[in-house]
A protein has these predicted regions:
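Glycine-centered flexibility motif
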Residues: 6, 57, 129-132
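Generic detector of well-ordered alpha-helical segments enriched in charged/polar residues
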Residues: 5, 9, 67-71, 103
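Extended catalytic/binding region for NAD+/ADP-ribose chemistry, centered on the ART fold
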Residues: 44-80
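Active-site and NAD+-binding cores of ADP-ribose-processing enzymes
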Residues: 19-47, 74-164
């Protein structure tokens, strides 16, 4: 985990992916925090009771997607945050970057939830050695076709194991 900038809000230029002179590239994975982020806690995943339950862990955005979403949808969150961090993933992250990957994820880890809606078994993914999931770029079509993905607002990932 690398602190990119502290108290960066005052340097935020609207409608740009450049913050305080630092350009957030599409390859970077970033998250913001109200307080200094000092330690990662592993999170035990559970099989969700319904599709809208996302995995638990440290969430990050791919490129400037999360920051851009916050600007328009939750500007208060952005205003309250003072720290921007870059995440480096070295471990076993399940990566979804296209329709074929998406179908494979649903085939391998999808299960029928209540009312016939499909969920993803985050617990099984963890048991099989994955320390997180990343879906980049964002897939708008899948959002409307897959109930479990509907709550994901941007290209993002979630890490639940510190070795990742």
């Amino acid at each position: 985990m690398k602190l990119l900038f502290e108290n960066w809000r005052k340097f935020l230029i609207k409608e740009q992916s450049e913050l305080w002179g630092h350009h957030i590239t599409p390859e970077q994975k970033v998250f913001i925090s109200k307080t200094p982020y000092t330690e990662f806690r592993n999170v035990q995943q559970k099989k969700p009771p319904h599709p809208m339950i996302k995995p638990q862990g440290l969430w990050y955005g791919c490129g400037d997607a999360w920051v851009a979403w916050l600007r328009t949808e939750q500007p208060d969150w952005l205003e309250e945050s003072s720290y921007l961090y870059e995440v480096k993933t070295d471990g076993k992250i399940y990566k979804v970057s296209n329709d074929a990957d998406f179908e494979e994820l649903e085939f391998d880890y999808g299960f029928g939830g209540r009312y016939g809606n499909q969920s993803i078994d985050w617990e099984l993914m963890q048991k099989e050695g994955y320390g997180g999931i990343e879906i980049c770029p964002y897939n708008w079509q899948r959002r409307t076709d897959s109930d479990w993905y509907y709550g994901w607002d941007v290209a993002s990932g979630c890490i639940w194991d510190s070795s990742s």
